[in-house]
Amino acid sequence: MLGRVDLRVALIAASALIASVSVSQAQVELKTYMDDKGYLNVRALTCAQLANTFQEDADFLGAWYSGWWNGHLKRHSINPARAKQGIHEVIVYCKANPDTKVVDAVDDYVKKVQAGGQ
């Protein structure tokens, strides 16, 4: 019983640490990266910029990139579960590779999926 309590305390402490690390990093609004006309150059956006924005903005951009790639590949349907998983994987990749362009991260992910790596 004592071991279970210790494990529970350790898990709670680890969760709190992870949450504090995520929150401690400044989140930047997407409008910071927009030009004076309100446009965002999606080809120039870096993984650091994606990873440092608010989660809902990162998810929105992920959905946009997904649609962009599906259009590029001439696909006219979506698998929502796979798209959400892909968006999550790209965001995680971007957090680990901040200097990479988001379009390159998405391209790498698409190639991985096409090769059967998912």
Task: Please report, for each region that a protein language model flagged, where it lies by residue.
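Bacterial N-terminal signal peptides that target proteins for export
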Residues: 1-11
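Bacterial N-terminal signal peptides
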Residues: 10-20
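Sec/Tat signal peptide C-region and signal peptidase I cleavage site
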Residues: 22-26
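Short N-proximal segments of mature Sec-exported proteins
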Residues: 27-108
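Short, low-complexity, Pro/Ser/Thr/Gly-rich segments in the mature regions of secreted, periplasmic
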Residues: 106-118
